[in-house]
Design a protein with these regions (language model features):
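Non-catalytic DNA-recognition/assembly elements of restriction-modification systems
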Residues: 1-15, 39, 136-173
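DNA target-recognition domains and sequence-specific DNA-contacting regions of bacterial/archaeal
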Residues: 2-139
Length: 173
């Protein structure tokens, strides 16, 4: 069955606390920008915000297995979230409806189809993914059990690639 991406997920916008208010920054909540998208999964952050910064801005928190996508500037970078973090307004959080789609399956599908997705962006000066873009992205989904089976197989291969990359990185040093 075919679905629009917006029908199988909740699209959540990010935000930035006011930089001038010092008590909004250097807290315990990781705050991610596109610059922090250095791998498929990230555990390193350059900025942290406080609870007060989160509550007094349009920033939102991710949940485990959410998918982040860069929406401005460098459009289409993807990140699978493994823990809660806040994010800026140049990123959308795709929170899947787990009754319809497996998060890993959707992540791999987006990764494979990112060039096609980039063709749906808007903007006169800069390419931008907007909320409307998610209505234009259609995905044919197999049953959840098939999605899980496919994503499990890809994940094993992906983990081997990451392990080999780590070995290569260590050899360079």
């Amino acid at each position: 069955m075919k679905y629009r991406l917006s029908d199988i997920s909740t699209i959540i916008s990010g935000g930035t606390p006011k930089k001038k208010v010092k008590e909004y920054w250097n807290g315990s909540i990781p705050w991610i920008t596109i610059k922090d998208f250095n791998a498929k999964k990230t555990n390193s952050f350059t900025n942290y915000i406080s609870e007060k910064g989160l509550n007094n801005s349009s920033a939102n928190l991710t949940k485990e297995n959410d998918i982040l996508i860069s929406s401005r500037g460098t459009v289409g970078k993807l990140l699978m979230v493994k823990s809660g973090m806040a994010f800026n307004q140049s990123i959308y959080d795709i929170r899947t409806d787990t009754k319809k789609v497996n998060s890993d399956y959707l992540y791999y599908w987006l990764y494979k189809n990112i060039e096609e997705i980039k063709q749906k962006v808007h903007g006169s000066v800069f390419d931008t993914i907007t909320r409307e873009t998610f209505d234009l992205i259609e995905i044919a989904l197999p049953d959840l059990s098939v999605q899980s089976e496919i994503s499990s197989k890809i994940k094993v291969i992906d983990e081997k690639i990451e392990a080999n990359q780590q070995i290569n990185d260590n050899l360079v040093v």
